[in-house]
């Protein structure tokens, strides 16, 4: 068709044939058409691509949203489980506490019922006993009157004659008592003759003083709060068992608020446990592995403290040149007591006393101090080694000391072996001075109570005694007697009999005053 137009089209004024113009025109039109089609196709392609990208983004966002929703759901479920478990645990604890309280209330109620029943039984028993006593007393009065009449008939003596005979007998007893007291004064006067010899000892006492500590078998460690008790006990008691096994002591965790008691007869173990427990409380990490670590460190610190204490004690006692083994063993005495007196302080005091006595007697002061300082070294290991502390101490000193004077002073100061050297007498005298001075030592509470009880039992064992009281720390006994059974002369005789029984049956320091009190009241009314 283009050829037709090109052949038939006339020429234009521009010189181009019409067919050429038409061809150009149609080419332009066709280009526009194809360009439009290409543009439409390209635009469709772009739109399809954007649509696919948008679909992928939407799919990814949907997947992310599902994952996030799943995480939120899992977290919410975990929180719900945690809250439910916490609530169940708290509920169980409250139920357990309520059950415990209910058991305590039941136990207290049962105890009160038992006490009430016992009180009723005691009341009934006392009533019956009172009736029996009244009947017995009436019978005794009747028997007494009958026996008095019978005695007068048998003895062919009146009451006045019997009193005269009794006074003569008492006069003889008083003469014997006077003779005994005269002998006591004679002994006392002879003892005063030795006062000059004791002057050396008194001068030594005036120049020496030391502190005294109380003997104990327990230590109390304070706690920041009662919650710490549960942490110390641990799950199923594993922490407290680990601590007791590592230290060798007993831990007492009771109702005492904010406190734990350490009990042991070994003072070194007790000190190790105290330091370890204090560190665990401060640190807060309490479990068996940590307990073992802290106890090991505490043992090292206590050993170091014992060495330091031994060195300090040797310096205070004026004893120099001791071997490190002796210093360490002497340091153990810091935690050892005897009748309330610290043995290390006692050793320092004996060393100073021995040096002073030695200087007065003109012997080697250095050796006297050394023997006095080491005289009780056996007490540091007497829990672990068989034998007396003097034998143990002498054997230990023989290993480390070359001086025979020091060995004799240690071995002979308690007269376990025959005392043949002056060193044994010096150390023995210094030891007695340090131990016997007022306030240095005191008997244990158990022995003290036993002695008071024994005094009261002796007094109560006599007929006619109503009540007896041991007072003034056992230095006096006051006896209340029944006035209708014991008269004034009988009270005097009772006092002497009790004194004799105490002298024969008890050992006691100093003197014991026996006071018999007889009180008679006569009441009448004027009408």
Curated annotation (Swiss-Prot):
GO terms for molecular function: RNA binding; RNA endonuclease activity. The keyword Cell membrane applies. Its main location: membrane. It holds the Pfam family RNase_Y_N. Its EC number is 3.1.-.-. It is found in: Cell membrane. CDD domains: HDc, KH-I_RNaseY. The chain crosses the membrane at residues 21-41. Residues 343-436 form the HD domain. It is a single-pass membrane protein. Keywords: Cell membrane, Endonuclease, Hydrolase, Membrane, Nuclease, RNA-binding, Transmembrane, Transmembrane helix. The keyword Hydrolase applies. Residues 217-302 form the KH domain. GO terms for biological process: mRNA catabolic process. SMART domains: HDc, KH. Residues 78-97 are annotated as: Disordered. One of its GO terms (cellular component) is plasma membrane. PANTHER family: RIBONUCLEASE Y. HAMAP family: RNase_Y. NCBIfam families: HDIG, RNase_Y. Endoribonuclease that initiates mRNA decay. Belongs to the RNase Y family. This is Ribonuclease Y. It comes from Dehalococcoides mccartyi (strain ATCC BAA-2100 / JCM 16839 / KCTC 5957 / BAV1). The lineage of its organism: Bacteria, Bacillati, Chloroflexota, Dehalococcoidia, Dehalococcoidales. The gene is rny.
């Amino acid at each position: 068709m283009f050829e037709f137009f090109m052949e038939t089209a006339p020429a234009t004024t521009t010189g181009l044939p019409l067919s050429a113009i038409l061809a150009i025109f149609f080419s332009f039109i066709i280009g526009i058409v194809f360009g439009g089609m290409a543009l439409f196709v390209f635009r469709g392609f772009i739109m399809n691509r954007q649509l696919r990208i948008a679909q992928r983004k939407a799919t990814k966002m949907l997947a992310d949203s599902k994952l996030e929703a799943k995480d939120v759901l899992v977290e919410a479920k975990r929180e719900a489980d945690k809250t439910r478990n916490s609530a169940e645990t708290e509920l169980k604890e409250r139920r357990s506490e309520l059950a415990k309280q209910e058991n305590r209330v039941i136990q207290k109620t049962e105890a009160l019922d038992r006490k009430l029943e016992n009180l009723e039984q005691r009341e009934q028993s006392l009533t019956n006993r009172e009736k029996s006593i009244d009947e017995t007393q009436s019978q005794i009065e009747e028997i007494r009157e009958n026996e008095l009449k019978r005695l007068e008939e048998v003895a062919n003596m009146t009451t006045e004659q019997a009193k005269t005979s009794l006074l003569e007998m008492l006069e003889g007893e008083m003469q014997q008592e006077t003779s005994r007291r005269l002998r006591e004064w004679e002994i006392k006067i002879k003892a005063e003759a030795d006062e000059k010899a004791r002057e050396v000892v008194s001068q030594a006492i005036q120049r020496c003083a030391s502190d005294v500590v109380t003997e104990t078998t327990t230590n109390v460690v304070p706690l920041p709060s009662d919650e710490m008790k549960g942490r110390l006990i641990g799950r199923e008691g594993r922490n407290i068992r680990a601590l007791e096994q590592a230290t060798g002591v007993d831990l007492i965790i009771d109702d005492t608020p904010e406190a734990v008691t350490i009990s042991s007869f070994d003072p070194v173990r007790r000190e190790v446990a105290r330091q370890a427990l204090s560190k665990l409380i401060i640190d807060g990490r309490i479990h068996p592995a940590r307990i073992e670590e802290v106890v090991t460190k505490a043992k090292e610190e206590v050993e170091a403290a014992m060495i330091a204490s031994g060195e300090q004690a040797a310096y205070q006692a004026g004893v120099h040149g001791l071997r490190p083994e002796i210093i360490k063993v002497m340091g153990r005495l810091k935690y050892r007591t005897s009748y309330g007196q610290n043995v290390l302080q006692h050793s320092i005091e004996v060393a100073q006393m021995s040096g002073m006595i030695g200087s007065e007697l003109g012997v080697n002061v250095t050796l006297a101090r050394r023997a006095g300082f080491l005289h009780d070294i056996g007490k540091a290991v007497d829990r672990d080694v068989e034998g007396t502390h003097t034998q143990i101490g002498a054997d230990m000193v023989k290993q480390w000391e070359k001086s025979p004077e020091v060995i004799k002073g240690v071995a002979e100061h308690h007269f376990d072996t025959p005392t043949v050297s002056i060193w044994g007498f010096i150390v023995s005298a210094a030891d007695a001075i340090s131990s016997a001075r007022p306030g240095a030592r005191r008997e244990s509470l158990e022995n003290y109570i036993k002695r008071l009880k024994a005094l009261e039992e002796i007094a109560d064992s006599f007929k006619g005694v109503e009540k007896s009281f041991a007072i003034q720390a056992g230095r006096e006994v006051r006896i209340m007697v029944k006035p209708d059974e014991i008269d004034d002369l009988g009270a005097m005789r009772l006092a002497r009999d009790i004194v004799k029984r105490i002298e024969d049956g008890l050992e006691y320091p100093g003197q014991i005053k026996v006071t018999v009190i007889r009180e008679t009241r006569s009441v009448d009314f004027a009408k």
